Amino acid sequence: MTRPIQASLDLQVMKQNLAIVRRAAPEARVWSVVKANAYGHGIERVWSALGATDGFAMLNLEEAITLRERGWKGPILMLEGFFHAQDLEAYDTYRLTTCIHSNWQLKALQNARLNAPLDIYVKVNSGMNRLGFQPERAQTVWQQLRAMRNVGEMTLMSHFAQADHPEGIGEAMRRIALATEGLQCAYSLSNSAATLWHPQAHYDWVRPGIILYGASPSGQWRDIADTGLKPVMTLSSEIIGVQTLSAGERVGYGGGYSVTQEQRIGIVAAGYADGYPRHAPTGTPVLVDGIRTRTVGTVSMDMLAVDLTPCPQAGIGTPVELWGKEIKVDDVASAAGTLGYGLLCAVAPRVPFVTT
């Protein structure tokens, strides 16, 4: 038998999350973002649950090819475009839509020998300051690309830096408006946060990512608690050991947790080598036998300890939810000083996945 830890994926929930996105942006088409191996869920496991999407967006060429080989015939958007000029041969073969965010990509596309034009997304830097042409260059770049024989349909894209913050998207929208004044074009601007909270930015295509998987773009579950979105992944395990400790005894490496009175401690088959956050402190929420309790002490490579005081019936084999439907990944991440995105993407290869 394998260790009891596993990641369960509820594909029906993923379908429902996509439906919620559509209701949030009813006039827009949807790019379902499956980058980072579908945010750690496994693109081959989940893509069929998103089959009602209008297109898939990702980074990795190999994953795009996999989708084509599995039978997806709709659009595929490569969010960072091609990384080497020679990649354009595969983009041509598999009919991939490419982002163009820099001069070298523009020149490579111009010089490529393609069988048919590629649809492109011209990326404008609206304040994130990662990729994209500066707003004042946008129209020149647009006209250069429009004149190329290798270019098919064109869309203008940008990525909001603060769609989940009080500052919002006002300044970014102002920059985009200046960049595109007088330009007739389709737009794709909205990430998960803007899809939920900024309908004025929906335009033609939205690009939801983390919300499809049932986590919050702000990192706070409370911000999406009333949307109907639900977690797709449940990371669960079991108690494999129980210790009854006296006052003054300590738990884990470094003895970071000290028992103040007699206390039962459960040892769970899960640790940082499985993707559970190493820096999750004492008090991080966890569910034991359906009862909310907390971790205690330091997370080790293969195990962590939990307080069994609220669940005296718990013993060897008792189920533990590390995150999922009841213990939200955002809450675990917040306790550990990180984001739910990072935890979902970091589930280790040694953890078996099951789909329902």
UniProtKB/Swiss-Prot annotation:
Modified residues (N6-(pyridoxal phosphate)lysine): K35
Catalytic activity: L-alanine = D-alanine
Entry-linked CDD domains: PLPDE_III_AR_proteobact
GO CC terms of this entry: cytosol
Catalytic residues in the record: K35 (proton acceptor), Y253 (proton acceptor)
Domain of life: Bacteria
Alphabetical list of Pfam families matching this protein: Ala_racemase_C, Ala_racemase_N
Swiss-Prot/TrEMBL cofactor(s): pyridoxal 5'-phosphate
UniProt family annotation: Belongs to the alanine racemase family.
Protein name: Alanine racemase, catabolic
Organism of provenance: Salmonella typhi
Gene name of the encoded protein: dadX
